[in-house]
Amino acid sequence: MANSASGMHVSDECKLKFLELKAKRNYRFIVFKIDEKAQQVMIDKLGNPEETYEDFTRSIPEDECRYAVYDYDFTTPENCQKSKIFFIAWSPDTSRVRSKMLYASSKDRFKRELDGIQVELQATDPSEMSLDIIKGRVNL
């Protein structure tokens, strides 16, 4: 189904891989991109379970918009192992204006397709999605 605001479709593969990340924990992260010609959100990169947050941030282009989900593991003050799934909307200041508008207008519709997101971050530079920011958001 297309998003009425931007006309974007979400590929079935996006939904399937997200379910695998959420239920089976087959992936640590997924980076998504919009294919403007196909008018579709598709997978750009899949991160293996053993990959780190640093591997994740390196997989996102410096000057191009992307959506991403990251499965963050942490230990609570009560010593319980938990995880939260973060949705990150990456829209760097250096990306094209058209691209920023396209990602912004498609974000909510795309996010609704990914049932199970617990925390959302919007970032325009790497400091806005640092590991410290992620750690600070798990207890909100």
Swiss-Prot record:
One MF annotation (Gene Ontology) recorded for this entry = actin binding
Tell me a GO cellular component. Answer: actin cytoskeleton
Sorted alphabetically, which keywords does the UniProt record give?
Answer: Actin-binding, Cytoplasm, Cytoskeleton, Phosphoprotein
Residue stretches making up the ADF-H domain: 7-139
Q: What SUPFAM superfamilies does the database record attribute to this sequence? A: Actin depolymerizing proteins
Which BP terms from GO are recorded? Answer: actin filament depolymerization
| Locations listed in the record | Cytoplasm, Cytoskeleton
Indicate where the modification Phosphoserine is found in the sequence: S6
Q: What is its main location?
A: cytoplasm
Give the matching Gene3D superfamilies: Severin
> Known InterPro entries for this protein?
ADF-H (IPR002108), ADF-H/Gelsolin-like_dom_sf (IPR029006), ADF/Cofilin (IPR017904)
Q: What does this protein do?
A: Actin-depolymerizing protein. Severs actin filaments (F-actin) and binds to actin monomers.
Q: Which family does it belong to?
A: Belongs to the actin-binding proteins ADF family.
- What's the name of the protein? Actin-depolymerizing factor 10
What organism does the record attribute this protein to? Arabidopsis thaliana (Mouse-ear cress)
